[in-house]
Amino acid sequence: MTSFKDVLDQLRENQPQGKYGIAFEKLMVNFFRTDPVQKSQFDEVVRWSDWRYNGGKADTGIDLVAHRIEDDSWTAIQCKFYKPSTYIAKNHLDSFFEASGRSFETENGPMHFKNRMIISTSDNWSSTAEAALENQLIPTSRIGMAEISESPINWDVAFPGSEIQINLSPRETFEPRPHQEEAIARTLEGFATHDRGKLIMACGTGKTFTALRLAERVAEANGGKARVLFLVPSISLLSQTLKEWTAQSRVDLHSFAVCSDSKVSKKAEDIATHDLSVKVSTQGADIAER
């Protein structure tokens, strides 16, 4: 099975260096259209040159633009196709921050980008570049090699000529194993006579996946709708669960993250909120609007 790293290696071998950036942008457009986490958030993703609101201006830092379904807003995206050893400094981000801070004209008048994303094939960030992602007026998140590599995607990419040919597809979802089916059935049986309960399963038996299939059964019995509150002790566990649920879900998920402590990402064992693949909020008013 071809991996994302294999695709990047093939890109470097089959494309002239001057076309690296364009080929990677096209690959990321298809990634956003196929990855279940991104696809659930955005209904349109295009390169800057193809965006109807670019005002006829050339790309000066913004490579892709995505339309967020939830709030009818636009997200500016920068794609950095670097060698894994490249060190990302703050000055690598300045032109993107400047360009995405400007307004753009639409048929409904001027608008601003409400979110930013930075995609990079290097995970080596300087402390100043890392700090630049924090406390931005326009929330800024990043997507690195690990997140893209772990995406449940079949990477079908070819180079028949001078142009990259991309045909990505989602991987198949799993069926519950016998012990998981039994856990789901017994839980539903318990809910028939009780309004709460506890499902205890051993480590490595697929608790997260079982919880997803259980939630889907509850939604099915409720006309296709259900509200799930998933409590976790860390942002990293939230990220892991969100990825697995979105990758395996057979119903549409509308997910958002709530963080009770804005400084939780400072803990060494956790990840930063800007590394989460969905919007994060600590504001009650913002959460209530959703």
Please give the residue ranges for each predicted region.
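Structural motif
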Residues: 73-75, 115, 227
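Catalytic centers of nucleases
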Residues: 20-111, 126
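SF2 helicase/translocase NTPase motor core
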Residues: 1-19, 39-54, 104-111, 120-290
